[in-house]
Design a protein with these regions (language model features):
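N-terminal beta1-alpha1 cap of cysteine-dependent amidohydrolase-like domains
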Residues: 1-82, 91-92, 98, 102-127, ...
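Conserved SAM-binding loop
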Residues: 85
Length: 200
């Protein structure tokens, strides 16, 4: 059973992890893997920009999660990011963010759905070259971080998945934990397949 450290304990993530046979642990030392979940925006000072659209900021969380990424990677342990987690990882590797984009946030409290196009690799193996995911974000990758690769994009060019060229880092902009179990949507992919593959 894979032991996962959630940087912020959120029930829907815990439920999704339980569904695939993973277990959340209380301390980073116990964990096999770090999972950075969704949440508010990363403060732009961490990527050398002034405030210009970022909202719901928690600088203490930003600093703590950046330190956790450093801790896990130094230990050779994988790091997985979801939504904000992808954005934070891009910042960690020296990238920037678009502080506000249109067309990707929730509508009336419900995740949007849109198509993404995947490069050859894990995502294409799991879901094919073109598949539908959910969307609930208003920020996105600007300048790509050093040694990061884009694995999937939305039709408008928004980066939807990244991985590091040599380190065990993988992240998606969508929410696989909200595409499995009670949150399964017939129009979109099965999020449990991705979570299972990442935690294998």
């Amino acid at each position: 059973m894979k032991r996962v450290y959630l940087s912020v304990r959120l029930k829907n993530y815990e439920d999704a992890l339980s569904l695939i046979g993973a277990r959340c642990v209380e301390t980073p030392r116990e964990a096999d893997l770090l999972l950075l979940p969704g949440g508010g925006d990363v403060h732009p000072r961490f990527y050398g920009r002034a405030l210009g659209g970022a909202a719901d900021i928690d600088e203490a969380r930003d600093g703590r999660e950046l330190a956790l990424v450093d801790e896990f990677l130094r230990a050779g342990k994988p790091v997985v990011g979801i939504c904000r987690g992808l954005q934070l990882l891009n910042v960690y590797f020296g990238g920037t963010l678009h502080q506000h984009i249109l067309g990707h946030a929730q509508v009336c409290g419900r995740d949007r759905l849109h198509v993404v196009h995947a490069a050859p690799g894990l995502l294409r193996t799991l879901y094919g070259a073109r598949f539908t995911v959910n969307s609930a974000h208003h920020q996105a990758v600007g300048t790509l971080g050093e040694e990061l690769q884009v694995l999937a994009c939305a039709p408008d060019g928004t980066v939807e998945a990244i991985a590091h060229e040599s380190l065990p880092v993988f992240a998606v902009q969508w929410h696989p934990e909200r595409l499995c179990g009670a949150f399964t949507r017939s129009e979109a992919v099965d999020g449990a397949k991705l979570l299972s593959a990442l935690l294998r």
